Amino acid sequence: MSNGKVALIILDGYGIGEPNAGNAIYMAKTPVMDSLLQRWPHTKLSASGLDVGLPDGQMGNSEVGHTNIGSGRVVFQDLPRITNAISDGSFFENPVYGAALDNAANGKALHILGLLSDGGVHSHIQHIFAMVKMAHDRGIERVYLHCFLDGRDVAPTSGAGYVSQLHDYCAELGTGKIATLQGRFYGMDRDKRWDRIEASYNAMVCGEGVQDPDPIHAMEASYAAGVTDEFVKPVVCAADGKIRSGDSVIFMNFRPDRAREMTYALTQSDFDGFARKVVAQDLHYVCTTRYDEKLTDLPIAFPPEELHDTLGEIVSAHGLRQLRIAETEKYAHVTFFFNGGTETQYPGEDRVLIPSPREFPTYDLVPEMSAVKVKDELVARIRTGAYDMIVCNFANCDMVGHTGVMPAAIQAVECVDRCLGEVVAAAEEMGYTLLVTADHGNADRMVEPDGSTNTAHTTNLVPLVLVGRELPLRAQGRLSDIAPTMLELMHIEPKPAMTGESLIEKS
C-alpha cells in the first residue's frame, strides 16, 4: 500500500491537439512527458463545455477548470447561469440591476462596462446587449458603454466586428452610446500594474485618451497602426460619457480576477494604486458577480453559490497537511478557485506565491516565466515530506500561449517539461503519487488551419497521467473526476456533494 501522499501538477493550457506544426506541445521536445506517457497509466479528460458546467462547445478556462477540479463536481458556471436568466426573463427582473437603473432614471447616467466579445471567459457580448435592452425598456436616457476589447479569448482583430454589432444594436434600439474603447491590457489588468488601470480610468472618468467620435474608425486606425484588440490604447468616443459622481455603473464581466482592480479604483475611498485626478463620488456600482470578498459595500447581481465539501476542505477535516503553490498569474486558481470560490484558507493548508515576472510587457519575451522558481520551491517542499496533498500550477503553456507567438510557446512547453522532470524525481524519492494534468488547452493550437494566429483556449481534451501507481484508469473522464481519484489514492471517502467519479477502474 502507498503512503497516501498525493501531488497534483496542473500544466495550465496543456491540451491534446492535432499532431501538426500549429501545435506548440507537439512541436516541442518533451522527453519527460513522453516517458511518463510510455511508463505510467494515463487517460484523457474533458475540460470544456457541458462537462465543466459551460454551454456545449464552450472552451474551458483556468477559473472554471480549477473550480471543477477542486470541488470534484461539475459546477454550473456564471456564463450559462446569466445566459439562462436572460432566456427565462429573470435577468430583466434582477433587483440589483434594477436598483442601479432606478438611480439612473433619476437624472443620472448609466455606464455599462465589460469585455466586448463572445469569448465567454470573462464576459459575453449578449449579456451586454441584454443590459442595453433592460435600460431601453426602463426608459433610461443616458446610457454609455465602456468597452474593453478582447483579442485574447477570441481572434486578435475580431474587435471591430463586436464594436460594429454593439453600435448597430444601440442604434436600432435608440438607446446607448459607445463612450470609450480600450484593450483589455489596460482596464482588465490583474497584476497591480496600476499604470495600465490608470490609463483606462482616465479615459472613462476624465475623458483623457485618443479622441475619436467614431468607434468604427477608431478600431480601423488602431489596426492600421499595427495594434490589435488587446492592446488598443484608450479611446474616448463620447465627450459627454464620463463617469460622474452619483452615476450608476454596472460591470458586466462575470469572472472576478480581471474586474477587481478597476472596481477598486472606481469605488474605494482609500484606493492608493495611483493618484486619481478625479474621483467620482457615490457611484451606484454593481458587480455582476462577487469580485472580491473585501468589497462588502458593493451590490452583486449574481452572488456566488456556496460550494462545500471541496477537496481542500475534506483533506483539512481529516487533519492532514496540504500545500498550494503557483506563480502570481495562477495563484488565485490554486487557492480561491480550487477551494470553490472562497478565500478561506483551511487548517493545515499552506500557500506559496512565487511572483510572476513584471518587468516584461508580454510573456513571449520571458517564456520560462517563474517556472524554475516554482519548481525549486515545490521540490524543496516535497523533500520535507510534510504534506499529504500538494497542488501546483505551472502557468507557462497558457500565459505564453495567449501571446500567439509560436517559438515562445514551444520554449514555454520545453521549460515546463524540464521542471516536471525534477518534480517527478523528487516525488518518486519521497514516495508521492503524482497526477499530472491540465485545466484546459491553449498551446496545443497556436495556429488555425487557415494560418491565422490563435491566442484563445481550445476545447481539446487534456491528459491525466498517474505517476507512481500501476492502477488501471477509465478510458475518459472529466476534470471533476480528479478530486475523487485523489481521495481514493489517499484512502479517504469523498462526501456525497462530490459527484465526480474516481478515474481508477473498479476491479
What are these language model-derived features?
Residues 1-507:
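Feature captures the catalytic ectodomains and active-site-proximal regions of enzymes
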